[in-house]
């Protein structure tokens, strides 16, 4: 499989480290997964720049350093079952699939889900389950989850997602208004309740209810 040239990949990994992505498993997964497969059209030549890029349905593929920092904050273990809310391009799910036992990823846009499925098949990632659904309600039939990651901003951590997090589990998500800078937070579920840590400022598209009208 053709990917970036060695110099581009080296610069990519250096940029990740310089932004604080230091976990060896996360870096190895991001080195292995070709971001270029998830960026199409006019922006395909910019896949290895540390910047968000537009994709279909008015969505974006997050900048790699943010993907790395969110994945690192999630502290994924090899036996974990992970829920991703907001498949988008599929890039984040592909990285999670290198780290976890099973990944469930949902998106409200069927078009994005179909496109991501094709790339997952190309990469032979057989431990990802994709579906078109309103991710703000999670996946009750598959709960509880060891880890949950949300790639769109909500004003607060959605109650259904908190309920589907295992005791001892971690959720990472951006919270805040969609038209301002948001805060990336990490939620840990304990026997007593939930502990919240603020990690860094971010900008994400809003988490919307319902299904997209893209068919």
UniProtKB/Swiss-Prot annotation:
EC class of the enzyme, as a word: transferase
GO molecular function list: protein-L-isoaspartate (D-aspartate) O-methyltransferase activity
EC number annotated for this UniProt entry: 2.1.1.77
Active site (record annotation): 62
Record-level GO cellular component terms: cytoplasm
Keyword Cytoplasm: yes
Subcellular location: Cytoplasm
Highest rank taxon of the organism: Bacteria
Entry keyword S-adenosyl-L-methionine: yes
Main localization of the protein described in the UniProt heading: cytoplasm
PROSITE patterns: PCMT (PS01279)
Signal peptide stretch: none
Catalytic activity, as annotated: [protein]-L-isoaspartate + S-adenosyl-L-methionine = [protein]-L-isoaspartate alpha-methyl ester + S-adenosyl-L-homocysteine
Keywords, comma-separated and alphabetical: Cytoplasm, Methyltransferase, S-adenosyl-L-methionine, Transferase
InterPro entries: PCMT (IPR000682), SAM-dependent_MTases_sf (IPR029063)
Any Gene Ontology biological process: protein repair
Assigned protein family: Belongs to the methyltransferase superfamily. L-isoaspartyl/D-aspartyl protein methyltransferase family.
Function: Catalyzes the methyl esterification of L-isoaspartyl residues in peptides and proteins that result from spontaneous decomposition of normal L-aspartyl and L-asparaginyl residues. It plays a role in the repair and/or degradation of damaged proteins.
NCBIfam families: pimt, PRK00312.1
The protein's name in its UniProt record: Protein-L-isoaspartate O-methyltransferase
Organism (species): Ruegeria pomeroyi (strain ATCC 700808 / DSM 15171 / DSS-3) (Silicibacter pomeroyi)
UniProt gene name: pcm
